């Protein structure tokens, strides 16, 4: 099967627990395709009158694309998007890229960006130290958080359970 020029390769990772270095590009492509699918699959009869359900950071661009690209262009004007979080530890944090890289206008940038004192972005291939202690060098680093952007643009934000909602909302 051929998937966007990737013949015979695994689209989301080489093996369980390991990310591709370009996952943000892959998932941006996935999110654009997810939005365009209902209108393209005319035999289903949905057109643009749909509710999208985005799950975790991997699909967090869906509500962003919907609000920043599609609706301003007069497309999917009735569509809604619910954003569901399954594990808040995985937020899709990356070093910033130009918004155009993901097919988004520059005006979307503020929804993604945050600053912290860590010189790294931690993920499965670059985990934080076990003791949770990192050295601060006194600098501030700008980063992007896809889950944050998804939450800011979703029509409804959900968690997998009422208890999980309470757990992630607590300061403990």
Positions of predicted regions on the chain:
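Catalytic cores of nucleotide-sugar-dependent glycosyltransferases that transfer UDP/GDP/TDP-activated
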Residues: 1-172
